[in-house]
Amino acid sequence: MSASLGSLRQDHADKAVRAPSRREFFRTVSLAGAAVGLGGARALSQIASPPPRDKALIAITLDLEMARNFPRWEDTHWDYEKGNLNAEAKRYSLEAARRVKAHGGVIHFFAVGQVFEQENVDWLKELNQNGHPIGNHTYDHVFVLATKPEDIQYRFKRAPWLIEGKTPAQVIRENIQLCTEAMRTRLGFSPAGFRTPGGFLDGLNGRPDVQQMMLDCGFKWVSCKYPAHPYGNPGEPATKEVLDGIVKAQADAQPFVYPTGLVDVPMSPISDIGAFRNARWKLDDFLRAIRLGVEWAIERRAVFDLLSHPSVLYPNDPDFRVVELVCDLVKQAGDRAAIVDLDTIAKRVAAAPR
């Protein structure tokens, strides 16, 4: 057992280094945050030499946030405390990372900034030290396409005074920058890329303002698009038609470049939330869908980006069958596939002729 994994069971027993209070932290960010908007985050997402195009690139991504309806269906309070990760989600993250690394791969994590308010962040440092990148998922899990204050996040709708006098664009930009500064302050390194809370059917197309915001915040690539696909009737087993529709949607989940030069590495259907909340599937149906999606990508030397959440997987897949399945499929493919992070995928698409 790792030292940080053991410490999670001690309810923040390590008092040697006091975490800054919320007031102290935001005061620090207010002084440092301007550097992000003025180019201080240029090193956040570097796109250098591309990987070869003769193999499928398979990514396993875990969003570090709590999700409504998990572990119990009546759990909805997480909407207001997305980053208050419980011990089970942290342990799941560490063990999933250990398993994937043992197979020669990495997991790309995305954390909401609220996570860095927790007293013990050693487990996040351990993930990074073991080669697993951690990206920015905004501070409060905000809706980056919002144009009205009440649409930004549940928390701000209930407490509008927190954003009074600011435009939605200002709130969203600040929320992104706060997550970056929180990571730098608590972990000592900058985020590896950016993922939007929620996936958008058309990504950031039609929103050049948001694309430019991402570039201004120092991100050369983002993960925003999540293509449309069928779910079937909630609670019913996945039918062939539903699974065929999910496979068909993989073509719409391939990475691309916006006119602004921003790269998007989409999330591949179906996500764990889509499977266990929307479709109310059993684990075996989710495994079938993931197998078909990964096999589609391997056959075409394409990209598959598994979108999951430790807070959703630990009650639904306690034996890590999903990550083990992906690792096994890539191993069976030999030199036709590799498990990589999203930066590696972004490098390949950025280098492709357009």
Language model features with spans:
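Active-site beta->alpha N-cap acidic-glycine motif
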Residues: 51-133, 142, 190-191, 195-199, ...
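N-terminal secretory signal peptides and thylakoid transit peptides that target proteins
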Residues: 8-33
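CE4/NodB-like, metal-dependent polysaccharide N-deacetylase domain
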Residues: 93-106, 157-201, 219, 257, ...
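Substrate-binding cleft of extracellular glycoside hydrolase catalytic domains
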Residues: 130-176
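C-terminal domain-boundary segment and adjacent tail
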Residues: 221-226, 283-354
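N-terminal twin-arginine translocation
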Residues: 18-24, 35-50
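Active-site-adjacent pocket scaffolds in enzyme catalytic domains
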Residues: 153-161, 196-297
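Acidic-and-aromatic substrate-binding clefts and catalytic sites of carbohydrate-active enzymes
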Residues: 85-90, 110-121, 142-147, 169-172, ...
